Amino acid sequence: MQPSQIIAIAALVVAAIIAIVVWTIVFIEYRRIKRQRKIDCIIDRIRERAEDSGNESEGDREELSKLVEMGHHAPWDIDDL
């Protein structure tokens, strides 16, 4: 093999590695943005229900807790939204 062929193959390998890294980062950011939109939607729904009825929906609060991976471990009501 000539040196130019070796350089071309090495360049293709490096380009493939860079492409994989970039698309992995894009995919991770896409999932993060999608999850954040879902959280924002649930928070908006909780606010609307709180305005309408004067209290929040427990189902929405539980769903939000699952999404943000936090739970209420205290036996009393904590309004930290």
UniProtKB/Swiss-Prot annotation:
Enhances virion budding by targeting host CD4 and Tetherin/BST2 to proteasome degradation. Degradation of CD4 prevents any unwanted premature interactions between viral Env and its host receptor CD4 in the endoplasmic reticulum. Degradation of antiretroviral protein Tetherin/BST2 is important for virion budding, as BST2 tethers new viral particles to the host cell membrane. Mechanistically, Vpu bridges either CD4 or BST2 to BTRC, a substrate recognition subunit of the Skp1/Cullin/F-box protein E3 ubiquitin ligase, induces their ubiquitination and subsequent proteasomal degradation. Pfam families: Vpu. Belongs to the HIV-1 VPU protein family. It is a single-pass type I membrane protein. This is Protein Vpu. The modification Phosphoserine is found at residues 53, 57. The chain crosses the membrane at residues 8-28.
